[in-house]
Amino acid sequence: MTFGPQPNSLTPLINNQICKKKVAIHAQGLNLILGGKTLLDNFDIDINAGEVTALLGPNGAGKSSLLKVLCGEIEATGSIEFFGQNRKQWSAKALAKHLGVLPQHSTLNFAFLAHEVVELGGLPLELSNIQTQQITQEKMALVDVCDLSHRLYPSLSGGEKQRVHFARILTQVSQAGDQCVLMLDEPTSALDLAHQHRTLQVAKELASNGAAVIIVLHDLNLAAQYADRLVIVNHGLIQADGTPWQALQPDIIERVYGWPVYISSHPTGDFPVILSH
């Protein structure tokens, strides 16, 4: 599917054929106004299981607010279903086993060791200590934080803390089965190049195993490389929704971000590369 002629206004460009998979989250008619600013404006979205969905858009577009509304951190008008059931009908305990949320900033001032922070993710699972430790070690290895295991959490760098919390939420949803949702708000913002790619590779692998993964990203090239679906948001509205090739059109990007770009093809992969003018 290709988009038709591009309008001059910020009319949403939406690929309505994209949602053919199992729907993990169905949100309809979301409205959110904070401080007099409309962050979500009659916002509808379905998030599919088995996909990485990247939320893109400029600062203040409503991306992080959408994640907070979907997970219940912020209340908004409208309806939200998780796997066909109203989110409010899920108990907190059940939701904790199936939904992992990585916020932009995680505050923890206690002098826990890094592995103890990761083990906190096992609290909802009601597993034995040995089982929890085994899962914890597996997830720490997955995101490359085993060497931080006995470091005090407050002594870690921002990127190290981010990876420790990623291991924690991976532990938390490790028993979710085929009803798993991960919401990652700028998970690569404090990471070096190698760990940016490692984090997104893990997200991609989880989606390939059936999880619904929603990621807020600012790096358009990382989104193009790892996401199955891109949803570009601005002014609380969806501006484009489709595959990387469909959504990352030069005129869309210039309208939304206010900056001209070139779109090229990656020399070794089937995804676009965005170059600034």
Swiss-Prot record:
SMART domains: AAA
CDD domains, A to Z: ABC_Iron-Siderophores_B12_Hemin
Origin superkingdom: Bacteria
Record's subcellular location: Cell inner membrane
Segments forming domain ABC transporter: 25-260
Chief localization: membrane
Annotated Gene Ontology cellular component terms: plasma membrane
Cross-referenced Gene3D superfamilies: P-loop containing nucleotide triphosphate hydrolases
Enzyme class (EC, first level): translocase
Sorted UniProt keywords: ATP-binding, Cell inner membrane, Cell membrane, Membrane, Nucleotide-binding, Translocase, Transport
Membrane topology qualifier: Peripheral membrane protein
EC number: 7.6.2.-
GO molecular function: ATP binding; ATP hydrolysis activity
Signal peptide boundaries: none
Pfam families: ABC_tran (PF00005)
Binding site for ATP: G57, P58, N59, G60, A61, G62, K63, S64
NCBIfam families according to UniProt: PRK13548.1
Family from the record: Belongs to the ABC transporter superfamily. Heme (hemin) importer (TC 3.A.1.14.5) family.
Function: Part of the ABC transporter complex HmuTUV involved in hemin import. Responsible for energy coupling to the transport system.
Quaternary state and interactors: The complex is composed of two ATP-binding proteins (HmuV), two transmembrane proteins (HmuU) and a solute-binding protein (HmuT).
The protein's name in its UniProt record: Hemin import ATP-binding protein HmuV
Native organism taxonomy: Bacteria, Pseudomonadati, Pseudomonadota, Gammaproteobacteria, Vibrionales
Gene: hmuV
